[in-house]
Each structure stands twice: as structure tokens, then as C-alpha cells.
UniProtKB/Swiss-Prot annotation:
Species per Swiss-Prot/TrEMBL record: Rhizobium etli (strain ATCC 51251 / DSM 11541 / JCM 21823 / NBRC 15573 / CFN 42)
CC per GO annotation: cytoplasm
Residues that coordinate or bind Mg(2+): 8, 57
Compartments, as annotated in UniProt: Cytoplasm
Stated name of the protein: Holo-[acyl-carrier-protein] synthase
NCBIfam families registered for this protein in UniProt: acpS, pantethn_trn
Chief localisation class: cytoplasm
GO MF terms, alphabetically ordered: holo-[acyl-carrier-protein] synthase activity; magnesium ion binding
Family as reported in the entry's similarity comment: Belongs to the P-Pant transferase superfamily. AcpS family.
Function: Transfers the 4'-phosphopantetheine moiety from coenzyme A to a Ser of acyl-carrier-protein.
Catalytic activity, as annotated: apo-[ACP] + CoA = holo-[ACP] + adenosine 3',5'-bisphosphate + H(+)
Coiled-coil features, chain-numbered ranges: none
Keyword Transferase appears in the UniProt entry: yes
EC assignment: 2.7.8.7
């Protein structure tokens, strides 16, 4: 069953300006080490960061909090499954909130899609509760 849905649309130019103005202070504050390593290898670095920023916003909305209630940017990170499919890895308060909305006897599957078409980047997150195997 679906227990959370979130979406976000961001202007890549806004992220470009943040990177230009704050540099590593911005990227280290908002992104995990895995996200920074992946984005810094990209030809269009700002678009890669923007997609990940949008994914965090969408995930926080799917959790029902937004960036509030002790949820920090680095509590949510975009990671890839072995198949290459993106998903979200939650830690800290975000992980606690996810556990709180999960029905008993269920585990979470976080579905993520991210895309960009300059000057916009977009993300959708669906949090699904799946019955645990016996």
C-alpha cells in the first residue's frame, strides 16, 4: 500500500548560484558523501545536484514533514540499487519518521524517479509499505 507521495520541481540555476556562492559549504551541508562523489563526476554538476536536492524535498514531503521536525538534508540520500535504479537511503530522524508511518508487519520500499531538462530538475517519491515475508 502507498503510505506517502511527494514531488518537487527546482530551477537548476538556483543550485548553480548556490554552488558558485557557497561551494563546498553548500554541497557538504546538503549532500551525502555518495551524492557528492557521483555529482562531482558529472559533466553537468549543477543538474546532478539539483536532481538530488529535488529528491530530498520530494522524500520529505512523502514522509509528511517537509524539511522540518528534525529532518536534515543529509538524513536523506539518493543511492542506486545494483540495477542502477535510484532510490532513497534514510538515516537519522528521517529513518525514525519512516518507521513511525509504517504499519506493523511491513517494510518500506521507496520508489524514486528523477529527471532534468535545463533549467528544471524534477523528482517524484512514492513510499510503499510491503508486507514482510513470514
Amino acid at each position: 500500500m502507498i503510505i506517502g507521495i511527494g514531488s518537487d520541481l527546482i530551477d537548476i540555476r538556483r543550485v548553480e548560484k548556490s554552488i558558485e556562492r557557497f561551494g563546498e559549504r553548500f554541497t557538504h551541508r546538503c549532500f551525502t558523501e555518495v551524492e557528492r562523489a557521483r555529482s562531482d563526476r558529472r559533466a553537468n554538476r549543477a543538474a546532478s545536484y539539483a536532481k538530488r536536492f529535488a529528491a530530498k524535498e520530494a522524500c520529505s514531503k512523502a514522509l509528511g514533514t517537509g524539511i522540518a521536525q528534525g529532518v536534515f538534508w543529509k538524513d536523506m540520500g539518493v543511492v542506486n540499487l545494483p540495477s542502477g535504479k535510484p532510490t532513497m537511503q534514510l538515516t537519522g530522524t528521517a529513518a525514525v519518521l519512516l518507521e513511525a508511518i509504517l504499519p506493523a508487519g511491513h517494510r518500506a520500499a521507496i520508489h524514486l524517479t528523477i529527471t532534468d531538462d535545463y533549467p528544471l530538475a524534477q523528482a517524484f517519491v512514492i513510499i510503499e509499505a510491503l508486507p514482510e515475508s513470514p
